[in-house]
């Protein structure tokens, strides 16, 4: 953890935090990227699991994982604008992926924007298809396998 993040707690979210985390995700994805708010939350029927970065009692970052069509997806990765550039997103991603892979998950799928693609490639992720455009920005399909992830961690 970096010196600037010592007051930030990274953890698995509790159910009572879901609404606040979804609001954060909607603010980022809808407010900044123009994605319709109704398309942002993961459907409850997919039983999403959430992780968060909190400062005090305020959520400043969120990410989710869910099972869809037999595959584990990781996404809705968001950090409040004023906390970007402090490695909070990177630490949240690492925390959530370590936790997810410790749950006997072998493979994670995601559709990612360029910055997240670079992060996932650094951790053993592989691009598995061509980018497509979603609400004006490129989304690239990426796969991250547990063994590759742990190997990249050293």
Where are these regions (language model features)?
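Short loop/turn motifs at secondary-structure junctions and domain boundaries
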Residues: 41-47
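Conserved beta-strand in the GNAT
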Residues: 52, 58-66, 73-78
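Conserved active-site tyrosine of GNAT-family acetyltransferases
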Residues: 120-121, 125
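Short amphipathic alpha-helix that is part of the acyltransferase structural core
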Residues: 2-36, 50-55, 145-154
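Conserved acetyl-CoA-binding loop-helix of GNAT-fold acetyltransferases
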Residues: 79, 85-98
């Amino acid at each position: 953890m970096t010196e600037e993040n010592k007051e930030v707690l990274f953890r698995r979210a509790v159910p009572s935090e879901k609404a606040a985390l979804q609001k954060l995700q909607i603010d980022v994805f809808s407010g900044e990227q123009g994605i319709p708010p109704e398309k942002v939350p993961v459907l409850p029927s997919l039983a999403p699991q959430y992780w968060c970065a909190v400062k005090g009692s305020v959520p400043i970052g969120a990410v989710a994982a869910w099972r869809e069509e037999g595959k584990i997806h990781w996404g809705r990765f968001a950090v409040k604008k004023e906390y970007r550039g402090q490695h909070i997103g990177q630490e949240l991603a690492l925390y959530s992926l370590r936790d997810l892979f410790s749950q006997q998950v072998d493979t994670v799928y995601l559709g990612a924007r360029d910055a997240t693609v670079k992060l996932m490639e650094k951790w053993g992720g592989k691009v598995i298809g061509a980018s497509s455009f979603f609400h004006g920005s490129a989304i690239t399909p990426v796969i991250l396998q547990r063994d590759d992830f742990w190997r990249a961690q050293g």
